[in-house]
């Protein structure tokens, strides 16, 4: 249910911000235009926000600066400690994409680099849950690595192997990265209109509105 990869972030918490800022050559393309991605998610969000996978709080900061009320959902203890120290007044809950509480009305669910922790069947379940919580016009704004097709995914894995970027390739094979057609079906099945915008070679912005 998304928690099987939580321990990976115990090792990554110390260097995560260095990775997203482009200091790790292997992940530089994954996090290209990182600040622009965070801003795009923030700009498309409405009202009260639930953020999945707060990490070290980079998207949280953008959302708070934009005036949103934010509830953070984070399954990793080390990451929660970092975010809690950075934002002492933030409501921060131990939870994940499928197992969470919302103590207030929610108008937007957001996440960056998180949705791939769920299998495709779990993604459908999650979207159905969000639809049951959101009002008509409520939004899901996710940014994550997505591929146009399974063939494109395999080609990217081969490219990373050829470049010697085996950590990236292993990640693409280990976790549940999916395709735009699969996600389009899942969003529409849950009652959302969805649009996709490519942000870099890996990441697409998903902007979904409940019908």
Question: What residue ranges belong to the model's regions?
Answer:
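Residues at the starts of beta-strands that form the adenosine-phosphate
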Residues: 48, 69, 139, 193
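Class I SAM-dependent methyltransferase SAM/SAH-binding core
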Residues: 52, 56-99
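A conserved beta-strand element that flanks and buttresses the S-adenosyl-L-methionine
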Residues: 110
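Core SAM-dependent methyltransferase catalytic element
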Residues: 190-211
